[in-house]
């Protein structure tokens, strides 16, 4: 048996999600090979080769894989699939687009967002916004799996796997790149941030996010998140959304400001190591999962907290 892990990367380096998905892939009990597909992605492939537990790295380097189009990548994975018993990828936005296509082309059922490998054919995954854990046994000869990486430790270095080039698959011609707008920020990306400060609908405006949430995040060296309600109201961009329909995070510290704690939001952050909630409603559901709670007006409490951090030299 051999498992193929699809790497999440930016060509220059691997994303943390890849290291964590490798831990899940290794738990299947088979040799793990890693596919790095991109343009100018040799550095990412070399990084994958250094990960402990990787037997071989496949590098598909070409313009076809430059812009994360799902159809060409799915076609490449399917062309490699006969050599593997399982195909694994982190459950990132990119692979939520790619892996269902792979499963459909292979005519198998995808097992989504697993949080535990019970056996090579049996997995646990959250359902009902994380309120129940479902055990799934796959009878498909070839497994297609995405991994909720927040529940797995990152694999370390220590390997020296060979890097082998593979040819690009035929372009299905089903999509073409038109353009992209990339959000640039000096703050940590949400899924890899050790500290996150998130704001909810109580922030009331985009300006208040900039006035209250962002200065606190800057003092803590944190990523900035938002609830779905805040994003839907236009107070924060989509890529800040934390929750079942946004990003699932598990930082060392999660600070929820003006977030009531809807079940959809809790599903995306309840695995955080320490949760701090600031809300003037003492009955807000967020306090049920918080390790520390402050019942206070955020417009008074957050500036005071930011100022105190400043005194500490943050």
UniProtKB/Swiss-Prot annotation:
CDD domains: ETF_alpha. It holds the Pfam family ETF_alpha. The keyword Phosphoprotein does not apply. GO terms for biological process: fatty acid beta-oxidation using acyl-CoA dehydrogenase. Gene3D superfamilies: HUPs (3.40.50.620), TPP-binding domain (3.40.50.1220). FAD binds at residues 253-281. Its cofactor is FAD. Keywords: Electron transport, FAD, Flavoprotein, Transport. The electron transfer flavoprotein serves as a specific electron acceptor for other dehydrogenases. It transfers the electrons to the main respiratory chain via ETF-ubiquinone oxidoreductase (ETF dehydrogenase). Heterodimer of an alpha and a beta subunit. Belongs to the ETF alpha-subunit/FixB family. This is Electron transfer flavoprotein subunit alpha. It comes from Bradyrhizobium diazoefficiens (strain JCM 10833 / BCRC 13528 / IAM 13628 / NBRC 14792 / USDA 110).
């Amino acid at each position: 048996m051999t498992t193929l892990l699809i790497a999440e990367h930016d060509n220059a380096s691997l994303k943390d999600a890849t290291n964590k998905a490798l831990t899940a892939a290794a738990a299947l009990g088979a040799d793990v090979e890693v596919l790095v597909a991109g343009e100018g992605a040799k550095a990412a492939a070399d990084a994958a080769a250094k990960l402990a537990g990787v037997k071989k790295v496949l590098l598909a380097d070409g313009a076809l894989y430059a812009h994360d189009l799902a159809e060409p990548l799915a076609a490449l994975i399917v062309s490699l699939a006969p050599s593997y018993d399982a195909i694994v990828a982190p459950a990132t936005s990119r692979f939520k687009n790619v892996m269902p296509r792979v499963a459909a082309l292979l005519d198998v059922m995808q097992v989504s967002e697993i949080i535990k490998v019970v056996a090579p054919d049996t997995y646990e995954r959250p359902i009902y916004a994380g309120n129940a854990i479902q055990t799934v046994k796959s009878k498909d000869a070839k497994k297609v799996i995405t991994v909720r990486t927040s529940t797995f430790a990152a694999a370390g270095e220590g390997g020296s796997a060979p890097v082998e080039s593979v040819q690009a698959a035929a372009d299905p011609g089903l999509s073409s790149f038109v353009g992209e707008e990339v959000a640039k920020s000096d703050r940590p990306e949400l899924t890899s941030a050790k500290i996150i400060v998130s704001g909810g609908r109580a922030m009331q405006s985009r300006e208040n996010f900039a006035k209250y949430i962002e200065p606190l995040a800057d003092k803590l060296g944190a990523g900035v998140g938002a609830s779905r309600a805040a994003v839907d109201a236009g107070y924060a961009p989509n890529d800040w959304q934390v929750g079942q329909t946004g990003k699932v995070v598990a930082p060392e510290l999660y600070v929820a400001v003006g977030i009531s704690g809807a079940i959809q939001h809790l599903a995306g952050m309840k695995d955080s190591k320490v949760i701090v909630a600031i809300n003037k409603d003492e009955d807000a559901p967020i306090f049920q999962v918080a390790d520390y709670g402050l019942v206070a007006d955020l417009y008074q409490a957050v500036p005071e907290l930011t100022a105190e951090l400043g005194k500490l030299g943050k």
